[in-house]
Each structure stands twice: as structure tokens, then as C-alpha cells.
UniProtKB/Swiss-Prot annotation:
PTM-bearing positions, type Tele-8alpha-FAD histidine: H96
Family: Belongs to the FAD-dependent oxidoreductase 2 family. FRD/SDH subfamily.
PANTHER family the record matches: SUCCINATE DEHYDROGENASE 2 FLAVOPROTEIN SUBUNIT, SUCCINATE DEHYDROGENASE [UBIQUINONE] FLAVOPROTEIN SUBUNIT, MITOCHONDRIAL
Consequence of gene loss (knockout): Disruption of mitochondrial function has no effect on the initial stages of photoreceptor development (R cells develop normally, adopt the correct cell fates, innervate the appropriate synaptic partners, and assemble synapses normally). However, beginning around the time of eclosion, R cells degenerate, progressively losing expression of synaptic markers and undergoing extensive morphological changes. Synapse loss is caused by reactive oxygen species (ROS) production, not energy depletion, as photoreceptor ATP levels are normal.
Protein name, UniProt field: Succinate dehydrogenase [ubiquinone] flavoprotein subunit, mitochondrial
Main function: Flavoprotein (FP) subunit of succinate dehydrogenase (SDH) that is involved in complex II of the mitochondrial electron transport chain and is responsible for transferring electrons from succinate to ubiquinone (coenzyme Q). Maintaining electron transport chain function is required to prevent neurodegenerative changes seen in both early- and late-onset disorders.
Cofactor(s) this protein requires: FAD
Main localization category: mitochondrion
One Gene Ontology cellular component annotation held by this UniProt entry: mitochondrion
Gene name per UniProt: SdhA
Organism whose genome encodes this protein: Drosophila melanogaster
SUPFAM superfamilies: FAD/NAD(P)-binding domain (SSF51905), Succinate dehydrogenase/fumarate reductase flavoprotein C-terminal domain (SSF46977), Succinate dehydrogenase/fumarate reductase flavoprotein, catalytic domain (SSF56425)
Amino acid sequence: MSGIMRVPSILAKNAVASMQRAAAVGVQRSYHITHGRQQASAANPDKISKQYPVVDHAYDAIVVGAGGAGLRAAFGLVAEGFRTAVITKLFPTRSHTIAAQGGINAALGNMEEDDWKWHMYDTVKGSDWLGDQDAIHYMTREAPKAVIELENYGMPFSRTQDGKIYQRAFGGQSLKFGKGGQAHRCCAVADRTGHSLLHTLYGQSLSYDCNYFVEYFALDLIFEDGECRGVLALNLEDGTLHRFRAKNTVIATGGYGRAFFSCTSAHTCTGDGTAMVARQGLPSQDLEFVQFHPTGIYGAGCLITEGCRGEGGYLINGNGERFMERYAPVAKDLASRDVVSRSMTIEIMEGRGAGPEKDHVYLQLHHLPPKQLAERLPGISETAMIFAGVDVTREPIPVLPTVHYNMGGVPTNYRGQVITIDKDGKDVIVPGLYAAGEAASSSVHGANRLGANSLLDLVVFGRACAKTIAELNKPGAPAPTLKENAGEASVANLDKLRHANGQITTADLRLKMQKTMQHHAAVFRDGPILQDGVNKMKEIYKQFKDIKVVDRSLIWNSDLVETLELQNLLANAQMTIVSAEARKESRGAHAREDFKVREDEYDFSKPLDGQQKKPMDQHWRKHTLSWVCNDNGDITLDYRNVIDTTLDNEVSTVPPAIRSY
């Protein structure tokens, strides 16, 4: 550590001054740079760093991320009496949850008879039978309660004429186990449901004594003796380091859409949580399953909600034809997202695309009444005008499949506990570590997520993390002890990147990664392209050692932050493309031209009774686990079984079958 440059004295003085301000406002809510009343102490442990100011904190629980899942976990913990720190790299209401448009699924039955068991069936089918049915059982059963809870918090749902929560049609949703036609299950706030949900949860969190650490960048988890004991974070405002100790840590950092060139994700969606977990030698799960949303605005990538099709919009090709009935005769434009994205891509590949280059299709809305567009899709009308120059009451929107969601993430059980496997392949709980939302893989989405199940995932499993922690721990218990040098490796990495003086800039290397992933891990994949992508990504990963950071400061250093984020993105991208190349089948969002069939342990086109089950190494209905092994980006893969059992006898397992819409 002797080569680390010493922080200027003015920075140390600023850090002390900020702590004095924190003490002065200790009677107020702990917020922003406030260090949490009596839980913080000034420190500069020689064993970590003699150069960087360090502040130690002790809490009952830590939540990393303040989107929907993080906020729901945080105030759920505080409600149970746990002193909770919320660490977030941006203000809570800027979290990407705000970008969700269409709605949140729950079998309320406001539009017609509905049942959560039908919702469960649709979710298992939508996952292409890769989803864990105990977790899907839990989520869909809890869904009606979760939505009513949101309503009680004040979430301003759109209403029917008789005052009930309005529910629209959404892709892959059916009645009577797929035999009763289209379901209207998606509870909506016009086309701004995520915005409303995030503000509702944030407002609710302010009713509780959550300790917010806003614009703090989580650098790494702190592990000792095989258990998670805290988090090391960088205060972006003054450059101080903060070491948080707690018996329980919840990862709620969202996805990593920014590993791709065209995506609907905010620039902050950089997979920080999955990368932090990977650096502790723990696996990520099913990262090869990346959802392409059918309707991103052509050329911009901005999301156009599936709710447009739920309200009666439909897709047309360059010849003006409605083409989805060729691919999904029953559901048509409301087939599952992977089906619609592939259908659009086929239309374009076969020369029926729209525009001068015939490289996109159209979403038509102008046949809908202007009043319906104004009331149910006001945000889309605005977005289409800004980003495509289109008046939706007069002309169609040019659209193209765009990276939207990561089905994979940190593997967890349905209680939110992070899991790994032992040498016998059995699930093992990682003590002290939880995950929820897009950062997690519980796995309720399997190989493909149904639209409007993501917001449901956030609130159900954010709450589940809080409940599990409350069941297993008592508030006010002593925080775990740490070794004097806990976090030392993370500080060394920070300092190394801060003073990196290589040949390639962060922006240039990030662009190379994004274009490689976009081309080599797209809607359709095949062996040679995937293998080429694996080779290219390995070289890009190695080039990170030659990164150049221009800004050496510690105060609002966006160059340094983007470099830390790129380090996280590279880990996620590498695991994604290696896992995709290894999976020799087509399932859900993973569609291979050279392996077009789904490979289950049984022949799912026939009755399962009497069939011999294939060994695990002869089929692909299994979860991929991926580990980052070293600084060169080498990836190790293993697999774990899909959970087919439900939580109890109130609902039966959904057996694998042909998936058609």
C-alpha cells in the first residue's frame, strides 16, 4: 500500500467537517451525507489505508440500492425495529424502477373472474419451464395482497367506471390455465406505473427512520469466515470511504442492461450487485437469458410499453400487414415477449421490414380513440413525439427489439436468501446475504419474464427479504466484528483505477464491449457467432488492465465512477456470453439457430408418465451457474436443478409442455 498517493489535507478537513455537520443534525432523519447518529465513528484504520479517510458504521441491516426492491426491503426492516442503512449511488427517485410503464400483475379479478393459480400457470409457461415453481407459487399468491398494500400506501392506480383498480391485457396472460382466453391482470397507473410505484414507496419510506446514504457508491461486499458482514462504499461528494458492518445485507442494485449497445436501461444499470457478489467467489445464475423488449423506439432504444398492445395497438411490417397471427395465432400481438421479438426479427430478416433500410417494423396506435390514448397512454404519446417525431394519433411508431431485462442474477431462494451449491450440487444458503429485484434470480422469470411481473417481483421479494431477516434475527443485536484490514483489497482496487494511466479510455472500451455483446448475443444466436463473441469479450476484458482514467480527484469524479461501473459490466458481460455459448438449446429468450429445440429431461410433447428421466448432463432444463475465476475474465460454469415442487398442496406443479401462444 506504500505506493498509494496521500489524500490532500483539505479533503481530510472536508471529511471531518461533514461528520461534524452530521452530528449537529443528529436529531433529524439520517439522510444524504449524515452518518447515522450514534452508529458512525470517525476512523482511519492503518490496516485499510493510511491515505484515505475512513468512517465506520454499525447497523442491523444494510440495503444496497434504493429502487423498488431496495425501498420495500428497507422500510420493511425498519418497521420490524431494525436499524437500517440504505446505500445508493443516486437519489432514490432517480432509480430505474421509474422507467417501468405498463403495470404490475395481480389476479384481482376486477375485469373478469381471475385466480392467482392461473397467474402462476402463465408465469411458469412464460419462463419456458425454467422458473422455480416454489418461488412462482409464492410470488403469484402474494400478488393481490401486494397490490392492495400499494393502494393503501396511496399509489394512484387508474380506475374502472365503478372505482376498482383498472387492469389491462398484457402479453402471455390467460384465464383458466390457458384455456379461457386473454386475461386482464395488469394493474396500471396509465403508462407511468413504475414512476408512481417508486414515488409511493419512497414516500412510504420517509414515514420510517431509514438512514439514507445517497450518492454513495458501493465498492465491495465485506466477507469473513464465509459470511457477509457488510459493505465498503465511496462517498461521491467528498471522497471518504465508509465501512458498513451489519449481520444482514440486501443487494437490490438492478440489472446490467448497459452491457449492450441498444437498451432501455438507464446509464446507471451497470450490474454492480452481481459483480460485487462475483468478486466474493459466489456464482451468478442464468445470465444468458437477456430479454429483448419487442418495442424499443427505432434508433433511440426508448421503451414503448407492452401496454400499447394491451390497449389494442398492433404491429405491422413494411407491407402494412399484421404479422403476429402467423407466429402466435391465438395471442397474436400479446404473445410472450421472446416470441414477439423473434417474430419481428424474422420479418426483418426475410425482407418485410419498414423504412428505407427495411430494418424495423411499426407499432400502430392511431386506430385507437384519441381519448383512450390521452387517458391510458399519455407518456407514450409524449415519448413517441420526442424520440421518433411521431404523432401517435396519425402515424405508427417505428420500433425494434431492444435489450430490456436480465432474467438472471444473484441466485436466491423464495425467501430472498442468496444461495450457492456445495460439492454435491446441493443448495447452500450464504449467511448474511440477500438479494431482490432484477439483481436477483429467485427464479420466478426463468428463461423469459412476463411483462408486468417485474414490478411485482420488486415488492414481493423486497418484502420477503425484510420478513426473512426479521424471522432469523433480533433488532439491536451486536454488529459482527471485522478484521482490522477488512476492505483493504477494495481500497487497493479503487486507488489503482484512480491512478490508471493506460492507453484506452473508459468510454472507448465500454463501447467495444457494448457493440460486441449487441452483435454476438442478440435475439438469434448461433455457435460460431457466440464463440467469436466469447473470444472478443475475453480480449476486451483483458484490455481493462490498460484503462486510462484522466480525473485523479475524489470529489464528484464521474470518470472514476464510470470506470468502476465498467469493471462491473465486464464481469456481467463475460458471464453472459460464456453461459450463452455453453447452452446448446433454444429456451425462452435464448434462441439458437444451430440448436432450435428445447431440451428437457423428458419428451414434453408426450405424457410424462412412464418416461425415463434423462441424466442432468443430457438435458438443459437446469439453471446455469457462472463464476468469474480471475483477473483475466476466465469463467467457470456449473448447473443446478430447477425446482418443480410448489410450497404446499394448495396448487399443483405445472408439468413441462409445448409452449405456444
